[in-house]
């Protein structure tokens, strides 16, 4: 496995090519350009790359599809068991989905960020999350999402 202390490798799973280009431009900005970006269209490609690259963080970008949301949460849970040192950040479509992901996630996440934020706020939140190396689920973003709505019942979780 590649071990490079000076370079932090960030994996982004994004199945929309236009969004992937947007994320590439975001990570080309001065505050994020010191990370080496690896784009994947699906989790299987990312799993194969895990054997060659020591990833610092996984950013899983979601659309509004329920099936994709369920698959994302299952993959992120599996990653938490097999590679607990990798940060797990989810980019949700909007604030509502971000709160939903915070409630439904079966594993601890480093952060959930809404893609509907302004570019400036999205960039700031990613800088904060990627700068926090050890504090999983101990950041203001997760606390804010969790405090916005009550926790879901087991029945509600099963339905969603």
Go through the PLM ranges and name each one.
Residues 1-138:
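N-terminal regulatory/sensing modules of transcriptional regulators
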Residues 141-160:
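Helix-turn-helix DNA-binding segment
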